[in-house]
Regions:
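Hydrophobic faces of transmembrane alpha-helices in multi-pass small-molecule transporters and flippases
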Residues: 61, 65, 97-101, 124-131, ...
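Membrane-water interface segments that mark the loop-to-transmembrane alpha-helix transition
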Residues: 23, 28, 32-80, 91, ...
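Signature of the first transmembrane helix
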Residues: 1-39, 194-221, 347-351, 366, ...
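Membrane-interface junctions at transmembrane-helix termini in multi-pass inner-membrane proteins
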Residues: 45, 104-130, 311-341
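Hydrophobic alpha-helical transmembrane segments
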Residues: 22, 94-98, 127-177, 344-345, ...
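Interfacial segments at transmembrane-helix termini and the short loops linking adjacent helices
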Residues: 15, 81-99, 286-314
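Interhelical loop/hinge segments that connect adjacent transmembrane helices in multipass membrane
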Residues: 124, 149-160, 166-207, 246, ...
Length: 408
C-alpha cells in the first residue's frame, strides 16, 4: 500500500496528488454511507448463527446497490463542479465516474468478500483476498507510473478502476463459494446498521474535514505532505485493526453469554493493542529520514509532519478496543452516541483549527480529540460492565435498559 502511495506522490507531483487526496476524501464519506452499515450486521449475525448467512448476504447486496447508485449520481453532479479533474468537461465527467464506481461500489464488493470470510471465521481466506487486492493496486501503480508515466488524476483513475475491477471479480467468486444470497431485507438490522454507518460517516467526516479545509488554506505541498503522513499513521494502525477483526466474531459469540465476557476480552486486548500501537508509531517515527527518498524532495514538510502525527495511533488503538466490545454486544446506540457526537463536534474543531492556525492546529486538535474519544469509549464500556455486575435485585431493571439500547 505504501509503495503504491509513494509512486503516486512522486509521479503525480504535489498539485495533482493533493487533488487526488481531496476527491478521495469525499468518496471516503460516501463509502461509509453505502450499504447503511449492513456489512457489520452480516459479520455479527453470521458469527452468532452461520445458517443466517444467505439472508444477510442478500440484505447487504440490496442495500449496497440501492445506496451506491444514489451516491454515484450525487458525486457525478457535485465533484465536477467543485473539483474539476481536467479542463475538458468530458474527461472530468468520465474520470469522476470511474473514481466513484471504484471507491464506492467496487470497494464495497471487495469488503463484502473479506467480511463474509471473517464472519465464517475463515481469516486465512480474508487475508488472501486483501493481499490480492493490495498486490493488484501495487502492480497497477508500478505499471502506470514507471512504465506508462502517468502524471494526472484522470490517468490514474483508469488504472485504479482496472485494479479494483479485477479484485472485485475475484471477490465475487470468493463470495459465491460461501453460499447463494437470499434477497430479503432483514428489517431489525436496519436501525443497528444505520447506527453503525453513522458512526463511521461522522468519523470519516472528522477525518477528512482537515484535508478539505487545508485544500482552501494551505499550499498543495503542505496538503500533500499531510496526506502522506496521515496515510502512514493509518497504515501503522492496520496491525491493530487486523487484531480487532480476528477477535470480533469471538466477541460477538461471547456476548450471547453476557456482557461480562466481552468486557474481560476487551481488557486483555487493551494491553495488546496499546503495545502494537506503540511499536507501530515508533517504527513510523524511525523511518522518517527515508521519506524524502521514497516520496520525493518536493514534499519539504513531510518529515516534521510525520514525526508529529505518528503517535496518534496509540489513543486510536485504545478507543478501538472499547468500540469493538460495544459493537460486538449489539450496543450500537451507546457506541454511536460517543462516535457521532465527538466526530460531529470534532469535524468542526478540526476545520476551525485548520482555518485559523493551519497545519499546526490540525495536528494539535487531532491528538486532543483522539484522547477524549478514548476516555469516553472506555468510560462507557466500564459503566455498562459495572451495571451488569450489580446485585441481582438491580440487574433485572438494567437488563431492560440494555435490551432497549440494543433495540433502538
Amino acid at each position: 500500500m505504501l509503495l503504491t502511495f509513494g509512486l503516486l506522490a512522486r509521479h503525480m507531483g504535489h498539485e495533482q496528488f493533493a487533488l487526488n487526496a481531496t476527491i478521495t476524501a469525499l468518496t471516503n464519506l460516501g463509502v461509509q454511507i453505502c450499504g447503511l452499515g449492513s456489512q457489520e450486521s452480516l459479520v455479527r449475525r453470521v458469527a452468532q448463527d452461520e445458517s443466517f448467512y444467505p439472508e444477510m448476504l442478500g440484505h447487504v447486496h440490496i442495500l449496497n446497490i440501492a445506496t451506491g447508485a444514489v451516491l454515484i449520481l450525487i458525486g457525478l453532479v457535485a465533484i465536477p463542479v467543485f473539483f474539476p479533474i481536467s479542463e475538458d468537461p468530458m474527461v472530468t465527467f468520465a474520470a469522476t465516474g470511474l473514481i466513484l464506481v471504484t471507491n464506492i461500489i467496487l470497494l464495497k464488493i471487495i469488503w463484502l468478500a473479506t467480511n463474509s470470510y471473517i464472519a465464517h471465521s475463515n481469516f486465512g481466506g480474508a487475508n488472501k483476498l486483501e493481499m490480492l487486492f493490495a498486490a493488484l493496486r501495487m502492480i497497477a501503480a508500478i505499471l502506470a507510473c514507471t512504465v506508462f508515466g502517468i502524471t494526472t488524476v484522470a490517468e490514474w483513475a483508469v488504472w485504479n478502476f482496472a485494479a479494483h475491477a479485477i479484485a472485485a471479480m475475484a471477490a465475487m467468486v470468493a463470495i459465491s463459494r460461501l453460499g447463494r444470497p437470499k434477497f430479503t431485507i432483514v428489517r431489525e438490522e436496519i436501525p443497528l446498521g444505520l447506527m453503525f454507518a453513522s458512526q463511521f460517516f461522522f468519523k470519516a467526516l472528522r477525518g477528512n474535514a482537515d484535508i478539505l479545509v487545508l485544500t482552501a488554506v494551505a499550499s498543495s505541498e503542505v496538503l500533500g505532505s499531510y496526506t502522506i503522513a496521515r496515510r502512514l499513521m493509518e497504515a501503522s494502525y492496520m496491525a491493530v485493526e487486523a487484531l480487532n477483526r480476528i477477535l470480533y466474531p469471538g466477541s460477538a459469540a461471547a456476548a450471547v453469554q453476557g456482557l461480562g465476557r466481552v468486557f474481560e476480552r476487551a481488557k486483555r486486548m487493551l494491553f495488546v493493542a496499546t503495545g502494537i500501537g506503540l511499536a507501530s508509531a515508533l517504527f513510523v517515527w524511525l523511518i522518517t529520514p527515508l521519506l524524502p527518498v521514497v516520496f520525493g524532495a518536493e514534499y519539504a514538510s513531510l518529515s516534521w509532519i510525520n514525526r508529529s502525527l505518528c503517535w496518534a495511533v496509540i489513543p486510536i488503538a485504545i478507543s478501538a478496543t472499547a468500540f469493538e466490545a460495544l459493537g460486538a454486544s449489539s450496543l450500537q446506540k451507546v457506541r454511536a452516541k460517543i462516535t457521532n457526537i465527538s466526530s460531529f463536534v470534532g469535524a468542526g474543531v478540526v476545520a476551525l483549527a485548520a482555518w485559523l492556525v493551519g497545519i499546526d492546529g490540525v495536528i494539535a486538535s487531532f491528538y486532543a480529540l483522539e484522547i477524549i474519544i478514548a476516555v469516553l469509549a472506555w468510560r462507557a464500556l466500564s459503566r455498562v460492565h459495572a451495571e451488569t455486575t450489580k446485585p441481582q435485585t438491580d440487574q433485572a431493571a438494567f437488563a431492560g435498559s440494555i435490551h432497549a439500547a440494543r433495540a433502538e
